[in-house]
Amino acid sequence: MENTVAKLKRLPIKAFTLLESLLVLFVVSFLLLGLSGSVRAGFNQVQEQLFFLEFERLYQETQRLSLAGHEKFSLKISGRQISNGYQELDFPQTLQEHEQQVIQFDRAGGNSSLSKIIFQTEDRTVVYQLYMGNGKFKKTTASG
């Protein structure tokens, strides 16, 4: 039996120095922090848009409940929540607290006020102007 001994070649292994490793870690961390800030801002905007769509849906749903049941309904906005007695909608963190406001719907589904509902986000103001009688609204958005 022949014993074959293979000699292993030694490859020079070059490793990063501590300074190079720290530099790479710093650059990668800086990039990740920069990207997470823009992702967070985008997430907040999407969350706000979904809130406004849900608010409009809740407003119209309360109208339909009032009309279908021939009952008076109210949509209550208080603090950080909107409720019609059956459903609740919480404010996203980026929206400021809202003063207490109640919108009354009559048995025909219309409201009896010309009130404005104003929501303040970090970078814009969203105003819902309610029309009396028919229960419709006009949404306007202003920066700042």
Locate the predicted segments by residue.
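Residues at secondary-structure transition points
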Residues: 13, 46-53
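Conserved catalytic core of two-component sensor histidine kinases
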Residues: 25, 49, 56
